[in-house]
Amino acid sequence: MSLADFMEQRVQVITNDGRVVLGSLKGFDHTTNLILSDSFERIISMDQDMETIPLGVYLLRGENVAMVGLVNEELDSEIEWTKIRGEAIPDVVH
């Protein structure tokens, strides 16, 4: 699969610094710069409820992208995100 297969679909992006950003993939280029719409960041921690930060239209630089995957929206909607706790994703080390 290529990013072209993900166009106009909800994706989850994990950045090199461990952030989790979700949104509808609107565009990309050969350096994996991504354009997302209706995007938001999920912040999960051990001691607080999951926080959602709306981002709207968002550009992610390819050098900061560690992973891009499709979101199973049915499964995602069944998860009680307010009850999820977890450690932060560590930075990517090259």
From Swiss-Prot:
Domain annotation Sm: ranges: 1-74
Location(s), subcellular: Nucleus; Cytoplasm
Entry's Gene Ontology cellular component terms: Lsm2-8 complex; nucleus; precatalytic spliceosome; telomerase holoenzyme complex; U2 snRNP; U4/U6 x U5 tri-snRNP complex; U5 snRNP; U6 snRNP
SMART domains: Sm
Keyword Methyltransferase among record annotations: no
InterPro entries reported for this sequence: Lsm8 (IPR034103), LSM_dom_sf (IPR010920), PTHR15588 (IPR044642), Sm (IPR047575), Sm_dom_euk/arc (IPR001163)
Main localization of the protein described in the UniProt heading: nucleus
Function: Component of the nuclear LSM2-LSM8 complex, which is involved in spliceosome assembly. The LSM2-LSM8 complex plays a role in the biogenesis of the spliceosomal U4/U6-U5 tri-snRNP complex by accelerating prp24-mediated annealing of U4/U6 di-snRNA. The LSM2-LSM8 complex binds U6 snRNA terminating with a cyclic 2',3' phosphate group; RNA with an unmodified 3' hydroxyl or non-cyclic 3' phosphate is bound less tightly.
Subunit structure: Component of the heptameric LSM2-LSM8 complex that forms a seven-membered ring structure with a donut shape. The LSm subunits are arranged in the order lsm8, lsm2, lsm3, lsm6, lsm5, lsm7 and lsm4.
UniProt protein name: LSM2-LSM8 complex subunit lsm8
Organism of this sequence: Schizosaccharomyces pombe (strain 972 / ATCC 24843) (Fission yeast)
Gene from which the chain derives: lsm8
